[in-house]
């Protein structure tokens, strides 16, 4: 892959951190946008960190303007940011409208606004690559039996948000066809993250081989979409789930 300048939102999260590490290792310039503590240190000249509230369009515009001015171009943006309310994950019966509206705005609304603004920069450059992060829960109904015996659940708003991101991807790819842009999304299955043993066991029964994924499994697919090998792929949802969604 040619050396690129890449923005990673949510770059200190589970998938975002693994992606940022991978990109830095390959020699790319990586601009991590996150409100969390820097987990990558300050010893890499190719790493740049920015704190920004991605729910506010004025901050998004400032961020993208800053990157465009400082680096002269931005080759790609990978949107891994995943802000949640404190009561995220409650069962449907306990879901409150205020929380629902906030999560839809924070995750789905901000995805549209971020996409709109980075694409404006891409159009000025006459090239760009946008990768959004969805989920297999945006493709199919949850397999509720997987959660039996645990306190976990799959929130209805999560399915709505992630299916919306797949639709946004396809819409944008079609809307900006013939503009020399690549716009795709990635839908991972469950990621290993100190989850209950019962859930891990139930989940693996639904898969072909591995079960829960490592962040690296998702990063490999994102790296492919960032590379020249995917030059003629756009508007697609790439699924990485070890067969869970079958």
Residue ranges: model-predicted function:
Residues 12-13:
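Conserved glycine-rich cofactor-binding loop
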Residues 20, 105-127, 134-138, 173-174, ...:
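Amphipathic alpha-helical dimer-interface segment in Rossmann-like NAD(P)H-dependent oxidoreductases
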Residues 75, 93-113, 127, 131, ...:
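Catalytic Tyr-X3-Lys loop
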Residues 78-88, 242-243:
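Conserved NAD(P)H cofactor-binding loop of Rossmann-fold oxidoreductase domains
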Residues 87-104, 149-154, 202-204:
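Short alpha-helical oligomerization interface
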Residues 177, 182, 233-235:
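Short, small/polar-rich loop/turn modules that mediate ligand/substrate recognition or access, typified
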Residues 214-240, 245:
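C-terminal substrate-recognition "lid" of short-chain dehydrogenase/reductases
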